[in-house]
Regions:
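Conserved class I S-adenosyl-L-methionine
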Residues: 1-52, 57, 61, 144-173
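A short acidic, Gly/Pro-enriched loop at the edge of an enzyme's catalytic core
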Residues: 103-113
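A short glycine-rich, Lys/Arg-flanked "PGG" loop and its adjoining helix->strand segment in the class I
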Residues: 129-141
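Short alpha-helix
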Residues: 186-203, 209
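A C-terminal cap/extension of S-adenosyl-L-methionine-dependent methyltransferases
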Residues: 208-262
C-alpha cells in the first residue's frame, strides 16, 4: 500500500500546480476569492505562515506586499519551484514540512496561518485533527487561521458526469451515503457540516465558511462557456456577494473555513 507521501508526490510530480490558479477561470476565481478573504483580515507587516504552500502563488504574492511569510510545503517538486520563483526576494522563507507536524515552530508565532491544501489529502481523523491543532497552536491569540477544503458534492459534479457516476459514488460514499475517507484516497471531500464539526471544542471562534470557485469547474468544459476578460472583475465581485450563502456552499469545489484563535 502506498504511503500518503508517495500518493501526493506522485500526483504533484506530474501535475502543473504552478499554473493551476491561472490557466482556468475556476482557478482564477479561486485565487481572487481567497486573496479577498486574506486581505479582509491581514494587517501590514503581519507574520504569515502558509502550510501546503505549493509552488508559492499565495506566499509570494503576500511577500511582495511586505508581509513576513514562512512557506511550508510537503512535496519536494513543488518546493523546488517555490524556491526558484522566490529566489532573491525579501520577506519569504521556505521549508519542507508536513501540516501534521509543525514542531519546528513555537506556539503563537504567526499573526495569520493559511492551510490552503493539506486537508485535501488527509484521510485519517487523527491526522486531520493534528493538522488543525498544529495550525491553531502556532497562531497568536486573536490571529486568523484559514483552512481550505473540498466539497464532496463539488467533486461529484465536476468529475463524475462522464459516464463514470457509479465509480464516483463508490469512491466517495458508503452504501448508506455517508462520506468516505480512506487510505490511498488522493483528494478527500467533505459535507459542509461534517467539516465544520471538526472544529468543535477547539480554541477558535468561527467567522465564516465561504465558497471560492462556485460551480465554475463543473461547467467550464461546456462548449459555450465564456467569461470575457473585460467581465471577469465584475464576475468576481458578483460571486463574492454570494460566496457565503449556505445554500450554495455544497456545489462549490473549493471552500474556505475562516476562524479566529481564542
Amino acid at each position: 500500500m502506498s504511503t500518503r507521501m508517495e500518493i501526493i508526490s506522485s500526483f504533484y510530480n506530474q501535475a502543473d500546480e504552478d499554473s493551476r490558479l491561472q490557466r482556468s477561470r475556476h482557478g482564477q476565481l479561486e485565487y481572487a476569492v481567497t486573496m479577498h478573504y486574506i486581505h479582509r483580515f491581514i494587517k501590514p507587516g503581519d507574520k504569515v505562515l502558509e502550510i501546503g504552500a505549493g509552488t508559492g502563488r499565495y506566499s509570494i504574492a503576500l511577500a511582495k506586499e511586505g508581509m513576513e511569510v514562512t512557506a511550508v510545503e510537503l512535496v519536494e517538486s513543488n518546493l523546488d519551484i517555490l524556491r526558484k520563483n522566490s529566489r532573491g526576494m525579501d520577506h519569504i522563507r521556505s521549508y519542507q514540512g508536513d501540516a501534521a507536524d509543525l514542531s519546528c515552530f513555537d506556539d503563537q508565532t504567526f499573526d495569520m496561518t493559511l492551510v490552503l491544501g493539506p486537508l485535501y489529502h488527509l484521510y485519517e481523523a487523527e491526522d486531520v485533527h493534528r493538522a488543525i491543532d498544529e495550525a491553531v497552536r502556532v497562531t497568536r491569540k486573536n490571529g486568523i487561521v484559514m483552512f481550505a477544503f473540498l466539497s464532496v458534492f463539488g467533486i461529484m459534479y465536476a468529475n463524475y458526469f462522464q459516464g463514470n457516476w457509479a465509480a464516483g459514488q463508490k469512491e466517495n460514499f458508503s452504501e448508506d451515503y455517508h462520506v468516505r475517507h480512506f487510505k490511498e484516497q488522493l483528494f478527500t471531500g467533505y459535507d459542509i457540516r461534517e467539516f465544520e464539526q471538526l472544529f468543535e471544542g477547539k480554541p477558535i471562534q468561527w467567522i465564516t465558511t465561504a465558497g471560492t470557485d462556485g460551480i465554475v469547474e463543473s461547467i467550464e468544459d461546456r462548449l459555450d462557456f465564456m467569461i470575457p476578460d473585460e467581465d471577469f472583475s465584475a464576475f468576481v465581485n458578483w460571486y463574492l456577494a454570494f460566496s457565503e450563502k449556505r445554500e450554495l456552499l455544497g456545489s462549490t469545489n473549493h471552500l474556505l473555513y475562516v476562524c479566529r484563535k481564542l
